[in-house]
Amino acid sequence: MVLSPADKTNVKTTWDKLGGHAGEYGGEALERTFTAFPTTKTYFPHFDLSHGSAQVKAHGKKVADALTTAVAHMDDLPGALSALSDLHAYKLRVDPVNFKLLSHCLLVTLACHHPAEFTPAVHASLDKFFSAVSTVLTSKYR
């Protein structure tokens, strides 16, 4: 999926507005994913998955940091996310559907925290961006 110049602007502008909260939102979205889609917990048997878990928050920050990298490299997502793609495809073997589930929970989390900024255009742009990131992360499964 190709991001238009307007999509890129929407994503960058929205991500910039998150400020220091990206890691917090990443943790919240990950917790939301585990709650709404319990099968996603199978990849984290060594984690404390309870509400407010430090491990979930730390992993959520990693997710947010990876997305921050992706936002900074929207014109070269495959290059920017190559190592992460290798990790998820070859070592962790995460079912690709889980990226879609987490993307949905990220959209919900961002909409809850920034309802005024979460216009239909921004929603569509973020959805396309998360889809593009998911496609890159699953590209090495083939």
From Swiss-Prot:
Where do the annotations place O2 binding? H59
Task: From the UniProt record, give one GO term of the biological process aspect.
Answer: hydrogen peroxide catabolic process
Q: Which domain of life is it from?
A: Eukaryota
Q: Which residues belong to the signal peptide in this entry?
A: none
Keyword annotations = Heme, Iron, Metal-binding, Oxygen transport, Transport
Assembly description: Heterotetramer of two alpha chains and two beta chains.
Name listed for the protein in its UniProt record: Hemoglobin subunit alpha-2
